[in-house]
Amino acid sequence: MTDRPPTLADFKAPYPEPGPDQTCCIILLEEKPDEEENYRVELIPGRVMEDGLATGTVSGVVREEVIHGWGYSYYVVEMEPLVTTRRSIRSFHRPTRFVPVPTKHFIRYNSQLPVVVYLPHNTELRYRVWTPIDMQKVEPTEPEGLLKIEERAG
């Protein structure tokens, strides 16, 4: 067994090759001792930017695609052009920070298949695993506890 990172060929499924301006990230999820359908994976694409030089926002979308005939999902990140507001900075030291795309993209947790994500070269991918907590019951509200909105004839 080798310690090299997995490649698309390791999974014996016809995942597409990355485009010329894309890179491919593969996330291998650990098997969970309880029901995996209770977990979610949040994909967090973004860019690493110099902090202090400009205030930047990034926007983009995560699109799900399916390998025809296999039913395996993969995800394609599309980034919009960077929007920045320049600020003056006197320091020569410019720290960097990760600026995530503000949309939340959750996918089903499945340790049997890799999470395959294609993203532009200048984009970084991070992810978070959301775990279940105890379910809480919500009691219905009685009608007298609701506010009434009066309609005015105009």
UniProtKB/Swiss-Prot annotation:
Ranges in a coiled coil: none
SUPFAM superfamilies with a match to the protein in the record: Ecotin, trypsin inhibitor
GO CC annotations, alphabetized: paraflagellar rod
GO biological process: symbiont-mediated suppression of host complement activation
Cross-referenced Gene3D superfamilies: Ecotin, Ecotin, trypsin inhibitor
Molecular function in Gene Ontology: serine-type endopeptidase inhibitor activity
The family this protein is said to belong to: Belongs to the protease inhibitor I11 (ecotin) family.
Name of protein: Ecotin-like protein 2
